[in-house]
């Protein structure tokens, strides 16, 4: 809505305080506002058809006459009558002062409509929205250019050049707007600001290179979508700054943007207007965001003098400047600490904004201490955290690490000053509020993506704190200075001891930011309002409290810096804190569900065991333990969402710790390459202990631990020290085990001495084997370290992140939730399964470079280290307590692989929490010695879902089994995203009974007392045959009425593109632009392949196909081909994960998108038969009655239909809608349930077109006869009606029929067929009305015997035609001109001579539209230059379609002539573009009834003969004017 105020010289407004009273201008009135430029008084543009607000003069304070007006605080009367509304200051209000002293104030959605106002705009939000609008317009221009370029004619060449100039100008304007936008205030998370700004600048360069210089590269059109994405990210921020006054500011809920229709109370209007933002530089305020502004306080009644004005920044006045972060001082082995002075000029709203910036270069560091800046703001109950920037910049040639930490935050609570200078003038302590909104980003997926950003930052901060604490420990234990100080001053405070330590200071500041971000994270998670998120957030808050309590011992001064955090979280006293901490520590050590400890924590407890009496070591160790628990719990919330069993001990398998709906955090909006958790691979050198300490956050072995991308020498030394201690521990454990074995009771005396000697020999052999295995392990570890160092160099160049670890994907509890299960409650599918997002990671570890070292990946799991050395095979089904005698006492011997891992008989049926991919590969290699490909374990229900043949025949076996089954390794990655195993191995776990079976589907894997008795066998069929068979089976699940696979048409899968054989292109010389070439003619399969191509998104091609497919196929065949395309198999033996990610998934999404467009445009295609509403055959009804239902017209049969096996089958086919529903339900298991629900909702959203309600005929005889009509309506009645009224009501009737014309009526010349009334009712209605009105014009003139009356009637018809021209009703205009130019009327020269010259000129001007030269060039030029609404002459389009149909073949060389369909679509598209915008004319029943009773002349030839005879009687040939005038009536 546009709001306009205008003023004049006598009453000029200086401030908005004076603009108080508004009234609405009457609706439907045109308001023309002229903005003048310079002295030329040149009009720039007009604003018309607006509902504006008129400004009243000022009124005296005493003029309150009780007329609904109220007096505000300043004594200015506010008129509240006539529905007055007030400005919403949260919208973009622009003030423009022109040369004629005219003020323009507007509330607008974007600036594309008013480019001249851009120079006056200072609101970042509307600049951004305008920029997005410009990008959308550029995309439209680009598509128009491509269309013009494809149709090379002389006229299109001129249009192409003109449009190309406009397009390049738009590119330049876009570049300027984007750069101006990036200069605005910081509206985003600082941690991602640099990457976003850098990406936007890079995209601008690419766009300018691809689209401005040289030819247009249509392949790079995705650059604009990427630019939109980054601009939207740039704008996101939680608004929490409220006006700097005591006014009641009403804000919307967190999921809704502020509505322009909200009405502020009159009492608050003055305060709102007085706080109107002044135009200032964006850099003057640190808290500008997209929804609210920092307002200058111009209210004289408010005594709260804030210093945070836009033009006078308090940060500069008080010399409290925040130190910059770019301090690269080259100091030599010195630690320079600069403390800036604090000027305590605290106002009533003073808050401490801490900013500490550290630039670390090797051992030289510069620490800039925080300063206090007084910024006057109030923080409402929403997070406004400029999240901490913790970016690691690594140089591979040196050990230089730059860490910048900035903490400038407003947090979750109302912030008030804690100083003693709080005056009574501060009225900001009780500001009512609602939850602010995400202005531009309201979609849940975007919120979730931003929550993930915060989560990543929290994990990064945990990692940094951990590294700095390790450095602190190394320094404390190795530096003699600290050792001496600690011995001399046992009671010395920790903060005093480490006050000059860089690691200590940085860790403290990062921890402050971590606490803030965790609160922000929890609050945002609660806003998502998913299942169990609120309960989970409470648990996480408790974990945060425990971390805070334990950290207070290490950082005693931390509470001084947390005055603007939610302090109610930390209200417990120190006694309760100590008790809670102790209890928590005890529970974590005694409760089996919490016995999992961090690798770092366990190592520290052993490495510093000699220093247990040292309180500092214990304190740091305690903080590290709590930090690991903290990061682990956060990771569980955002990562482990589907039946997580990673943090639960084997004794508590029945407990559920997951929240299935929380899977949105990983699968709702992220792709496979999106960073979710930090995976550190092959980062450090040393033993297996060092590598095991760097695991993913969702690892099942222990709580989370991190490492930085590069290590400082001190941290590397500590890791090496820990590795040595671990080796010593292992040796001590071996000695203890030997001592325990010696203490065991002696063997039974009845045992012979020979058997005893044999046992001793076996023990010695086993010990030798163990030593050999240890040596082999050490060699493998050394090789692994070398490969890790090489891979780490590549990782440092391009960090690799994965959304979840491969281990967590395979370790799946059988009792948990199922992947991709349809939610039966709301009939919608759950979000995409988590494991689908990790196919890339799994395949990289199995088939890529890392897959070559898959046998050595066991070292990455800390829980497997003890198994390597001691053979502790502790599984759920078989617990062996003795370490070296297990093999002798148990009959189930453990088979040892080459890597030294042992597995008992139960390890193949149940996955433990420490199982890794390398372990599974080793198990498979031992179980199937004849197979060269390792096998993997998979839960039975997971395998059960993907194997459909086995699904039907052995459903009862798999459903009753809870054990895991073995699948072939080759299947991994080929089916995880699609449910499509290329070579499914139906291996059936038996219930403890060995044997074989499976009905020829493979060898059965039976687990009994004898261990593994069976192996795996692959099928004899080839890979391509299995893929094709699976596609056929998937298709037959939808088309379940097919009884044989032979009835399935597989041509779309087998037919390959062969140029000049099954497809012909127009520009076939341009090989580089192959995917964007226009098809001239092709087979139906090739057209479907082009329609759903994975690498192309030609929307125009899609619309052309959907619009014209009826001319060469049927809806049943079209839907069948799309479904077959969805189940496209991998017949070219492409690498499976590449096929899934780059081919299969894009094709499936293209298919669903085509279905969506099809249903949106033509929902009637899915009805049997499609119904077309019309009024042509209805009796004329009263305005209060509804139209009667029409008989269902039959769909015209297309001229070309391809025969398929599906059509030739004798089985009765189900309806099209039923097949569509069955297919959409089948897509849910692939994670496309949300898309399917969206498509199905399109049917419910379809609305019937609004038709004009016509008055009923009194005589009830239907279409009247000619004689009755002429007798009923006299000449006086026609003269009594206004020419404009007749033209307007005729326009309403014509547009009602025109807007109802459907595409099916324009295909195959259906309007010229015998059944045109049923097939093309709306076209028939327009044609009949055209002929009726033309006949009415001729007969109304010729029925007047008096020449004067006849001349007057002719003038009346000319006026009606001219009124039709002014309304842009060219169809009615040409109908009236046809009647005036009929042979019987055209020859009445004496009658024409009585018409004035003025109307004769108008008539001659209108007759130019009838010029048929150059294919109606005059008419086409005028109609193309006219803006809608308009009604074109339908006859010309029907003529064009007839020429296209008759002049072009349907088939060429047996292929579909698609070029002909494009020509048809272009004509139909031009017809449709005028159907969108209608007329705003009120119907008049009396005139409508008169026009509806116009007689229909069935015999046009006879009517023309009758009118010509009547014309001869009125004006005989060779008669004079006088004779005609004297003739008798």
From Swiss-Prot:
Gene Ontology terms for molecular function: guanyl-nucleotide exchange factor activity
Compositional bias ranges of the Basic and acidic residues kind: 888-898
Highest taxon, organism lineage: Eukaryota
Compositional bias ranges of the Low complexity kind: 576-591, 683-724, 853-887, 906-916, 924-940, 1168-1187, 1197-1206
Disruption phenotype: Grows relatively normally on bacterial plates, but is unable to grow in axenic culture due to a loss of fluid-phase endocytosis. The morphology of growing cells appears flattened, elongate, polarized and dominated by a single large lamella. Able to aggregate but not to form slugs, and does make highly aberrant fruiting bodies. Cells move unusually rapidly and have lost the ability to perform macropinocytosis. Crowns, the sites of macropinocytosis, are replaced by polarized lamellipodia. The majority of F-actin is concentrated in a single large lamella, at the leading edge of the cell.
Entries under PROSITE patterns matching the protein: RASGEF (PS00720), RASGEF_CAT (PS50009), RASGEF_NTER (PS50212)
Domain Ras-GEF: start-end pairs: 1282-1517
Record protein name field: Ras guanine nucleotide exchange factor B
